[in-house]
């Protein structure tokens, strides 16, 4: 089939045109059985393809027809041997990767700055995480990728690990030398699992970091909805044969997936793949140019800083994605959280993320020059508004806490008897649940972690 075809979406449209009389779920029956206000807002076409896995429409759990064709086209587009559609988000795809290679007691090498879904899968599988410390940027106060040296050390000390998980690129857009990491892991016959939640587009442009499949990784959870144009909660899992059992992967993702599959989400993956495969390079080039214009404009504003190519040169910052706009506001004497609230209240601008020192804005295929000009004007106003704080020497100090050490396995801690105590009394106690801020969904506290007074003060 051609990458210009959309077998899943096209079949859904043809099915809706036949207008069959439905005596199956969903009970709203093309919108007729739901609140009219919502029906009018969503629209007839969307509700007409809100369908389930009846015989003419294939079955995500055992695809043989239009879903299989759509997944095969996605595999070809991303350079995978197999692609599985996920309507459980990239979290579901990440959990599938971990649970496909790990069982109770198995070791898995992971960066400490992994997403909650990785730790959730570790709890479900009973695996033992071996943390690799990411490189920390003392100027921005953010985590980058893992270094080649940390990977070498982890592999030498834990050559019996069942998998190595890598984030590529990070939430902030930085990438390590993934190809070399893959080669290292494969020399130990250890499969490489890639959290590619923020990198669906990198496969389709040569100036962006190397994608997981291009680097030879074994599995990659790739979030099409975040940056690739599909609907929220839709994602894909790309798999290469060899070190992983594809049938087992399919069984795990089926186990984690609802049987009431959303065909709207599946169709959005089909059409997003078509656009990326056929127009992606040109569209992403426009997006990069737009982002670089924004970066240059921000760096001309006093007391603001937007990192770019000058950050490259370490093992953990081998390459970067310029469409991620990090704006460091600490030299204004304010926090990223304050900047986020100010932009919302003054300019009706919503950013992707804020932390103590930065805000993060994503430039995607959906942005326009008008939108980015508004952002630039807003940041100029922000800098002017808080310039007095900067001139007075008010500074936000970057303080990076130590990475906690596990006292128990995450699974043992999670399923242990627990008690709720005041936060200030938690020093020396073992955490039983996740504590995190979303976005990005990286656990601050992880089940099994032992926390001390200084760590608690910094995290608070």
From Swiss-Prot:
Q: Where in the cell is it found?
A: Cytoplasm
- Similarity remark: Belongs to the Orn/Lys/Arg decarboxylase class-I family.
- Which Pfam families does the record associate with it? OKR_DC_1, OKR_DC_1_C
Gene transcribed to yield this protein: speA
Q: What are the record keywords, sorted?
A: Cytoplasm, Decarboxylase, Lyase, Polyamine biosynthesis, Putrescine biosynthesis, Pyridoxal phosphate, Spermidine biosynthesis
What Enzyme Commission number(s) does the record list for this chain? 4.1.1.19
Any one GO molecular-function label of the UniProt entry: arginine decarboxylase activity
- Using the UniProt record, give the first listed, main subcellular location: cytoplasm
Report the GO terms under cellular component. Answer: cytoplasm
Query: What name is this protein filed under?
Result: Arginine decarboxylase
Recorded hits in InterPro entries, A to Z, give: Orn/Lys/Arg_deCO2ase_major_dom, Orn_Lys_Arg_decarboxylase-I, Prn/Lys/Arg_de-COase_C, PyrdxlP-dep_Trfase, PyrdxlP-dep_Trfase_major, PyrdxlP-dep_Trfase_small
Record PTM N6-(pyridoxal phosphate)lysine, positions in chain: 226
One biological process GO term for this chain? putrescine biosynthetic process
What is this enzyme's catalytic activity, as reactions? L-arginine + H(+) = agmatine + CO2
The protein's enzyme class: lyase
Q: Which residues cross the membrane?
A: none
> Part of which pathway?
Amine and polyamine biosynthesis; agmatine biosynthesis; agmatine from L-arginine: step 1/1
Q: Which cofactors does this gene product need?
A: pyridoxal 5'-phosphate
Where in this chain does the entry annotate a coiled-coil region? none
Q: Briefly, what is this protein's role?
A: Catalyzes the formation of agmatine from arginine.
* Leader peptide range in chain numbering: none
